[in-house]
Amino acid sequence: MKRILKTWTPVVSLAALVAAPAALAGYKTESAYCYKNTDNSGGCYGSLLGFRNHSGSNTYAYFTQYYSGSKYFNAAYTSGTTTTYFSCTPNAATAVQWPKAMNHQGYFTVYWDASGACYSLYLNNGSQYSNF
């Protein structure tokens, strides 16, 4: 019996290692993208780390809140040699999330309508978005 266990132990161990999920230690997600429709509605998504490390030298994104209470999202996205600028002001429902967006280090998606009102803000956090 001991001989059989000794024979099968390496096989079972190898099978367990192969079946184990990957830990993804050190994995980082860096993405950045913005678009604008013909009616000036549009959206941006990615992470602030992704915008900072984007290959376009003029690419950036930030959430702002002034002392007066005014809130804005501003971004620039460079594709090739063309930089396009984006901005929106949150509506009442989206403005509630602004304090979270100000400290957010993960993935975000923000959409705005043709009048420039941010009507949707999606925030997703995870270790793969942080630069530790």
For the regions a language model picked out, list residue spans one by one.
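OB-fold/S1-family single-stranded nucleic acid-binding modules
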Residues: 115-132
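N-terminal, post-signal-peptide region of Sec/Tat-exported proteins
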Residues: 48-78
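N-terminal signal peptide c-region/cleavage motif recognized by signal peptidases
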Residues: 20-21
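Short nucleic-acid-contacting surface segments enriched for D/E, G, S/T with interspersed K/R
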Residues: 94-109
